[in-house]
Amino acid sequence: MRYLTQQDVLDFVEDNNVKFVRFAFCDIFGTQKNIAVLASDLPKALEDGVCFDGSSIAGFMKVEESDLVLRPDLPTVTILPWRPTEGRVMQFFCDVEKPDGAPFGGNCRGFLREMNRRFRKLGLTCNVGAECEFYLFENDDRGRPTRIPIDFGGYFDVAPLDAGENLRRDICLTMEQMGLAPQHSHHESGHGQNEIDCHHAGPLKTADNVMMFKQIVRAIAMRSGIHASFLPKPLPDQAGSGLHINLSLYLDGKNLFEGDIAPDSTAGSFMAGVLAHSRELTVFTNPLPNSYQRFGCDEAPRYVSWSRQNRSQLVRIPMVKGDNCRMELRSPDPACNPYLAIGLVLAAGLDGIEHRMVLPPPVNKNLFRPGEAEGLGLEMLPATLEEAVAIAEESDFLHKVLPEELSRRYFAEERARCEALRAAADPAEYERIHYFNAI
């Protein structure tokens, strides 16, 4: 990560004709927010931070103690290239703290940073990569999103079946301009479904990249008159969209996922921890009622199991070599807060290492096939958001690793989501208004 001083940032503003500066952060569900200041006010904002009303952000603060402060993470500074070149727009990702400088429990970037610090304390380095899927839909003549996909292509199709290739190219070129390093892009299985993968990076950088990636996709799609949706299951008869999280561990420069993984090795214990806590993590990796329509079909897992190569498993070990050796967690979806999702996966793996958990045997069966899981004694991922919340609320592990104010507010908001959907006169219309148009 580059080191920047406040003066470096001010020089950058001057050299690049920046007139507008966004201070970006996210709520506890991963919805990006921002406050903008004029470049002329940037020196004061860098020195003092930017104050805002935390009671207006989902899951943050109560009205009677609402003041919070944004502190920009200077190395995350970037130009938004889709904005005007005259009077350019610049953006930081920010940490959130209390006015007296005390840590704020809802600062999800801080939570992930702390989990990464704990790994480094053990001499371990963690790299993370994300594979993000999304849908592209047509807008109606008033510019409102429809559920009509822009094409009827399938996996790896090309034009004319793939109508999104030019948009993906524009997205990848924009990512490259902004330092996100796209690795692969292609049409996915669903009609109008696409996938773009980023090269791996450190945990915090990857979570920032996921947030920026979604911002880029939406901006480029909107510029083209198209609606980009990260809803996990926007079409009931098409594949769901995942956010597969790939992790590798290094000790003294050696990738611990390379070669055979002994059940009681560091890598084996890490995987065992992730599997052991996967049901508790699901409310964070899959935060919407819609998320649970994805499980159990179209390469999305249902059971707590692992294997090599097998895409019907929750965790798989791809057959690759060298630095590409890793574990892949296949349950998360793109509606999640990437800081919490990645941070909690690290926490689960760390718990496995610290308690020397032993990796169970692999399950070398196609668990998408009816009856294949019978007699194996496998646990299942939660079937609904209500079940996921109930499991998480009873988790000693989550109460130990998460700030109390964050977990309490998160669970309360999730229960409210369940109740609102249950009370809706037209659940499908409620989902369209509150999730399809926004996620």
Which ranges hold each PLM region?
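Glycine-rich, acidic/polar active-site loops that bind/position phosphate-bearing ligands
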Residues: 1-439
